[in-house]
Each structure stands twice: as structure tokens, then as C-alpha cells.
A protein has these predicted regions:
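A solvent-exposed interaction/effector surface
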Residues: 7-159
Length: 159
């Protein structure tokens, strides 16, 4: 195999993309449907407050989620080797929003929003790998680890 062939072969190998492999969850049709979502790994951060607040809890939570997600995604370039690792595209951010004691939504009172924001992780990520990513991202990003929560192989509770 010549040098150019190796380059072409390497470029042809695509990273696993959750959006493409699980279209029913990430690219829904225009008609409502009830789906059964299988158990999966998620990084989750729970909070309360206005999502538009500059430097607020929500914006901090998003930076925490992405810091950990990308630390895990790029782990193959470090000394930390994750068993069963394969390259993947970090899935999109997902969010669950609600307001207590309000029927419907009161958009005028964004400070009363409760939220859980999550990013799905591949099944090969275990608790030890997650803890490594939290520690590594904390050193790198200087984000407060007390704001971090994980939901490993646990479905989000229906509210």
C-alpha cells in the first residue's frame, strides 16, 4: 500500500455517530411518536435558574458537560486507555426543563426553571473512566467538580 492509499484508507474510517445510528432519538420525524429509549450512559448536571444568565448555573453546567465529554472522547490520545474504546462523535446536548407549581410554562419567569442537561456517553465508559475524565477536566478547565453529577446506565426519572 502506498502512502497516498494509507491516507485515503484512514480518512474513510468514520467515527461512530449517535445521531446517525439512533436517528429515531436524535432526528425525530415531524409526527409525534412514543419511543422506548434503552438504558444508556449519560453525564448529567441538574440545576435551577435562568438559562440566559451570563455566567449563570446553566452556562457553567454546559461547560462542565462538554469538558468531561471531550476529555473522554480524546482519551485515546492520552496515557489513560479505555477498554473497548472506539472513535465517536460527541452526541448533542439534551435537556429536560420544568417549573414547579406552574401549569404549562411561564416564559416570563425564567429564574424558576429547573433543568437537567445531559450528554450521552458510549457504553464502554465505566465509573473509573468517568472519574478519570472529571479529574482531568477539572485540572484542565478549572471547573468546580461539585457541580458535576453522573448517571451511569441509569434512565432519567420521569418527572
Amino acid at each position: 500500500m502506498e502512502q497516498d492509499d494509507k491516507f485515503l484508507f484512514k480518512e474513510a474510517v468514520m467515527a461512530f455517530d449517535f445521531k446517525k445510528e439512533y436517528k429515531e432519538f436524535y432526528m425525530p420525524k415531524n409526527t409525534p411518536a412514543i419511543l422506548t429509549v434503552p438504558k444508556a450512559n449519560y453525564i448529567a448536571v441538574r440545576g435551577k435558574g435562568n438559562p440566559n444568565e451570563e455566567g449563570g448555573a446553566y452556562q457553567q453546567a454546559i461547560s462542565v458537560l462538554y469538558a468531561v465529554a471531550y476529555t473522554l472522547r480524546m482519551s485515546y490520545k492520552t496515557d489513560h486507555k479505555i477498554e473497548g474504546f472506539f472513535e465517536y462523535v460527541v452526541p448533542p446536548l439534551e435537556g429536560f426543563w420544568w417549573q414547579e407549581n406552574i401549569h404549562g410554562v411561564n416564559y416570563a419567569d425564567k429564574d424558576s426553571f429547573n433543568w437537567i442537561s445531559v450528554i450521552r456517553l458510549p457504553d464502554f465508559v465505566n465509573q473509573k473512566d468517568f472519574e478519570w475524565a472529571v479529574e482531568t477536566a477539572t485540572k484542565k478547565e478549572k471547573v468546580a467538580p461539585e457541580k458535576w453529577k453522573t448517571v451511569i446506565r441509569h434512565p432519567i426519572k420521569k418527572l
